[in-house]
A protein has these predicted regions:
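FIC/Doc superfamily catalytic core
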Residues: 1-173, 177-239
Length: 239
């Protein structure tokens, strides 16, 4: 990935994104953790070591007995996170095209999809039933418009729109992974540390979504971002 010397965003230079892209050790750490945990939340059986080996061609680690889907999920998530970085570097903005490209990247070689879903979907373990497919385009149009014009507290905004995105469930597959990538898009755009939702926190995370608890989710995301900043400091981030 080509790195710009200075990355400008909302309110000035995106120092944190600049640090991530210039610090190869932290970049690999973030991509591997984000990929491993986001996929594990959705049921992937890859270990952390297997995920790293797939993402960075570590031939010293032998991977056996894994479904091709899981391998593609790892590769695709890395590519999608890099797409987030590229969007921010180029200041391409938050629009329908970007969201669709993220989801298409997540599903590459697994479930080839183009655009929003055309079938009814259901969320396992949730009483909420996402809207009918014919309603999705308009819902997403309003979602994107409101998102781009919302100036509330950043963590409150992220939590509200993450829950709304997951309730719309605009795609046939990959909604969770896409939604979590969008969280980090908004954090980095605002020069805030990214977050990694650990697979161990899967139940807690899903409870926020099931209960439509944007206040609780906002507070938790703020804690995760602060925790990530402490980790970044171990890689040389000065704050």
């Amino acid at each position: 990935m080509e790195h710009n010397l200075l990355i400008w965003g909302k309110g000035g230079i995106m120092v944190i994104l600049e640090f991530i892209l210039k610090n190869e050790n932290y970049l690999q750490d973030l991509i591997t953790r984000s990929t491993y945990h986001s996929n594990a939340i959705e049921g992937s059986t890859l270990t952390y070591a297997e995920t790293y080996a797939i993402l960075y061609n570590d031939n010293s680690f032998k991977i056996e007995g894994k479904e091709p889907r899981e391998i593609y999920e790892a590769i695709n998530h890395k590519s999608a996170l890099e797409l987030v970085f590229k969007n921010l570097q180029n200041d391409d903005g938050f629009d329908e095209r970007f969201i669709k490209r993220l989801n298409e990247t997540i599903n590459r070689n697994i479930k080839e999809t183009e655009g929003f879903r055309t079938v009814q979907v259901f969320i396992q373990g949730s009483e909420h039933i996402p809207p009918e497919p014919e309603k999705v385009p308009n819902l997403m149009m309003y979602y994107i418009y409101n998102y781009n014009h919302d100036e509330q507290d950043i963590f409150a905004k992220i939590a509200r729109y993450h829950i709304e995105f997951e309730r719309i469930h605009p795609f046939e597959d990959g909604n969770g992974r896409t939604g979590r990538l969008l969280i980090n898009y908004e954090l980095l755009k605002n020069n805030l540390p990214p977050i990694v939702i650990a697979k161990e926190d899967r139940v807690k995370y899903f409870e926020f979504l099931r209960n439509n608890d944007s206040t609780g989710l906002a507070e938790w995301l703020k804690e995760l971002s602060a925790k990530e900043e402490e980790r970044m400091k171990k890689f040389g981030y000065k704050g």
